[in-house]
Swiss-Prot record:
InterPro entries in the record: Ribosome_maturation_RimP (IPR003728), RimP_C (IPR028998), RimP_C_sf (IPR036847), RimP_N (IPR028989), RimP_N_sf (IPR035956)
Biological-process GO terms, alphabetical: ribosomal small subunit assembly; translation
Listed GO CC annotations: cytosol
Described purpose of this protein according to its UniProt entry: Required for maturation of 30S ribosomal subunits.
Taxonomic path: Bacteria, Pseudomonadati, Pseudomonadota, Alphaproteobacteria, Rhodobacterales
Entry similarity comment: Belongs to the RimP family.
Primary residence: cytoplasm
Keywords from the UniProt entry: Cytoplasm, Ribosome biogenesis
CDD domains reported in the protein's UniProt record: YlxS_C
Segment forming the signal sequence: none
Protein's gene: rimP
Protein name as catalogued: Ribosome maturation factor RimP
Record localization: Cytoplasm
Length: 194
């Protein structure tokens, strides 16, 4: 099975260490990456099973796994721990993500050449067995292609106005946006641009 959550052996090692604690807190791991640079960064993306996560919940995860990582000490060098939401243009790492975001535009890459290409951009059309279905524009036609999940090396949603609008609507419907915290928009009746 393809592992888009934790790609490298170090990512998988970190996942083995932190995933049980994150799940015990009631969250799901979306992606784990150890990224190099001047200082290594351990990036963990998580969310509630129903989607979404707030800053306080990220801090809760960070505090819980910081203690664990101090004990396990899996990284030799200094590192920064970054716990965040997957974001709007999120990575798609689990088969269920492709069902959840059916109807939205995504970019996908495969490890194998399929029809002479490895990169695809289209509208997610769900899942059938272990295949991710994608509607691709080919000329004036739309063709549905099934990509084996195990062949995927990368996948993420494309940031579109439609996606932003839907995510904001979901947050508002879930009561996560309190409109009373925003300033009222004042219009100047003497200014024709308002």
């Amino acid at each position: 099975m393809s592992d888009l959550i934790a790609k490298t052996s170090m990512d998988r090692r970190m996942a083995e260490i932190v995933t049980p604690s994150i799940e015990a807190l009631g969250f799901e791991v979306v992606r784990i990456r150890v990224m190099g640079g001047k200082t290594n960064t351990l990036q963990i993306m998580a969310e509630r099973p129903d989607g979404g996560i707030d800053v306080d919940e990220c801090a809760q995860i960070s505090n819980a796994i910081s203690v664990l990582l101090d004990v396990e000490d899996p990284l030799e060098d200094a590192y920064a721990l970054e716990v965040s939401s997957p974001g709007i243009d999120r990575p798609l790492t689990r088969l269920k993500d492709f069902e959840t975001f059916e109807g939205y535009e995504a970019k996908l890459e495969t490890t194998e050449m399929i029809g002479g290409q490895r990169r695809f951009k289209g509208v997610l059309a769900g899942v059938e067995d272990d295949e991710v279905l994608v509607n691709l524009e080919q000329g004036s036609e739309t063709v549905t292609v099934g990509l084996n999940f195990d062949w995927l090396s990368d996948a993420k949603l494309v940031l579109t106005d439609e996606l932003i609008k839907e995510m904001l609507k979901q947050r508002k419907d879930a009561g996560l946006i309190n409109e009373t915290q925003f300033d009222d928009i004042e219009e100047d009746p003497s200014n024709p641009e308002d």
